[in-house]
Amino acid sequence: MSLQYGAEETPLAGSYGAADSFPKDFGYGVEEEEEEAAAAGGGVGAGAGGGCGPGGADSSKPRILLMGLRRSGKSSIQKVVFHKMSPNETLFLESTNKIYKDDISNSSFVNFQIWDFPGQMDFFDPTFDYEMIFRGTGALIYVIDAQDDYMEALTRLHITVSKAYKVNPDMNFEVFIHKVDGLSDDHKIETQRDIHQRANDDLADAGLEKLHLSFYLTSIYDHSIFEAFSKVVQKLIPQLPTLENLLNIFISNSGIEKAFLFDVVSKIYIATDSSPVDMQSYELCCDMIDVVIDVSCIYGLKEDGSGSAYDKESMAIIKLNNTTVLYLKEVTKFLALVCILREESFERKGLIDYNFHCFRKAIHEVFEVGVTSHRSCGHQTSASSLKALTHNGTPRNAI
């Protein structure tokens, strides 16, 4: 394996931060006062990212709720995905005894809040205003410990999603069947089938057939938790169809097999092309991001320690022994495009770089228009930038 890392060509003018962070200025409904949340759930702990005061940037961020029984792994998921905690270190985390609010915005393209709920939360407690919390929530993630008896968890799942659906039917409901690293493949499939069947039967009995649950097998000891969170976050991105379309156009004109648009900090992929996601390919791309950041921390910082491990000049090429090439390029301050292609296709690097320049410009236009209009933009937004894409070296305007 060979690694090439260094500065790329002159960056696109204004690229560093031009597209900035996704829903920073999008309207997701006004969030209630933080004091209300504290009164509703016995206090809200300040997250590592720090919370903004009422009326600040918090009011435009989608909210993701992490719920589940005690010791199901909720806090571990949050720490591993968004705070780079080693999975082994999560063994020393204390149980959550109050609502813990984590603001994911200062160092990530993915701009939202995660509320980690204690396992003993009682919805029938008159002092708990669950309606206030469920209003304005983008997604509810319910974590079930697959290695434990999950009958009580299924009962709590049904109560939780039923109440949430009545308050906010537009919310996405996600179920993480967690800690599956200790189960055999057959046991994983059987556990997922059983939980899926029982949960949906309970909803059908309650007349909630329209309530859709999405199920994921997850573990903090592999990349499954990152992939699951990627799919959860993608549902909250109004520009997702546009991003997928841009990626499809880019790879079809550049001879690329697979491309991911990554949030560098969390390793969540914001979008990918329409071809199926192979877990091994995703893991390769995640590992490449780790390598690039680690190498950059060693050689990319200034003598006084200033600078950034990832900036507008970041670019890396890794050539594997099986003639596969991994190619990483900076898109925005927090986004990177990671491509998988064959060595013979990479011989046309000039073509790929030109098409990437057009792709990056289109991405910036998508989010600039989105911030201005407070709504997801259509495909017309980026049409002008993609007209210049070349196919087999021939400019579009020359065809």
From Swiss-Prot:
EC number: 3.6.5.-
Pfam families hit by this protein: Gtr1_RagA
Keyword Cytoplasm: yes
Highest taxon above the source species: Eukaryota
Region (Disordered): 1-20
GO molecular function: enzyme-substrate adaptor activity; GDP binding; GTP binding; GTPase activity; GTPase binding; magnesium ion binding; molecular adaptor activity; protein heterodimerization activity
Catalytic activity field: GTP + H2O = GDP + phosphate + H(+)
Modified-residue entries (N-acetylserine), positions: S2
Binding site for GTP: K74, T90, T96, D181
Impact reported for F92A: Promotes interaction with GATOR1 in the GAP mode
Subcellular compartments: Cytoplasm; Nucleus; Lysosome membrane
Modified residues (Phosphoserine): S2, S15
Major localization class: cytoplasm
Effect after changing K74R: Found in patients with follicular lymphoma; increased activation of mTORC1
Binding site for GDP: R71, S72, G73, K74, S75, S76, T90, E94, T96, H178, K179, D181, S219, I220
Gene Ontology CC annotation, any one: cytosol
Family statement drawn from the similarity comment of this UniProt entry: Belongs to the GTR/RAG GTP-binding protein family.
Disease connection: Long-Olsen-Distelmaier syndrome: An autosomal dominant syndrome characterized by lethal dilated cardiomyopathy, bilateral cataracts, mild facial dysmorphisms, and liver dysfunction. Some patients have brain abnormalities, including pachygyria, polymicrogyria, and septo-optic dysplasia. Death occurs in infancy. RRAGC mutations have been found in a patient with idiopathic dilated cardiomyopathy with ventricular dilation and systolic dysfunction, bilateral cataracts, and mild facial dysmorphisms.
Entry function: Guanine nucleotide-binding protein that plays a crucial role in the cellular response to amino acid availability through regulation of the mTORC1 signaling cascade. Forms heterodimeric Rag complexes with RagA/RRAGA or RagB/RRAGB and cycles between an inactive GTP-bound and an active GDP-bound form: RagC/RRAGC is in its active form when GDP-bound RagC/RRAGC forms a complex with GTP-bound RagA/RRAGA (or RagB/RRAGB) and in an inactive form when GTP-bound RagC/RRAGC heterodimerizes with GDP-bound RagA/RRAGA (or RagB/RRAGB).
Name of protein: Ras-related GTP-binding protein C
